[in-house]
């Protein structure tokens, strides 16, 4: 297996990114796919593109994908309450999402106090070394959901994680999601207005979580997601 990562930006502002793990014979297809994604993204033109390929040497951990639960009546406040995330912590997370800073990774907050627990500043925590081995999906929208579920599954597969809130920073994509070990993966429609780059990924955790081990799991452990 090989890890392939793409990051594209304009004047150091993040435009697009993608990542997966695949077999050698699939590398060329992913390189073409990520190249085209970078140069044809709705967020604008790029002046920098990085494509990185590494052989996966560490053992791969298998994770079962979070179930997709569709409920048009879901609200963030209700979901947060059901997963042990305080209203104050939820609002702090939304502040990070709505500010004008572009974070390239996730932000970790206390689910109780809303205090930021990671110290990565604008970089954030990057979930890497992952691939969705099997997925019952098709079409462009389902491709987005597949990638999002893979990330959500990894983020929520560690003791002490309460939930995750994600809002895309793509200009015209207004569907976000709220995911948790307890409630699964739930899309939230019209979570932001069209035409804005506001977005971000917030992870709500217990303050007693082994933060160093969690970050290492997200950033360095190879993870393969499968359907149940």
UniProtKB/Swiss-Prot annotation:
Coiled coil: none annotated. Signal peptide: none annotated. It catalyses: heptanedioate + ATP + CoA = 6-carboxyhexanoyl-CoA + AMP + diphosphate. GO terms for molecular function: 6-carboxyhexanoate-CoA ligase activity; ATP binding; magnesium ion binding. Keywords: ATP-binding, Biotin biosynthesis, Ligase, Magnesium, Nucleotide-binding. Its cofactor is Mg(2+). Pfam families: BioW. InterPro entries: BioW. Pathway: Metabolic intermediate metabolism; pimeloyl-CoA biosynthesis; pimeloyl-CoA from pimelate: step 1/1. GO terms for biological process: biotin biosynthetic process. Homodimer. Catalyzes the transformation of pimelate into pimeloyl-CoA with concomitant hydrolysis of ATP to AMP. This is 6-carboxyhexanoate--CoA ligase. The lineage of its organism: Bacteria, Bacillati, Bacillota, Bacilli, Bacillales.
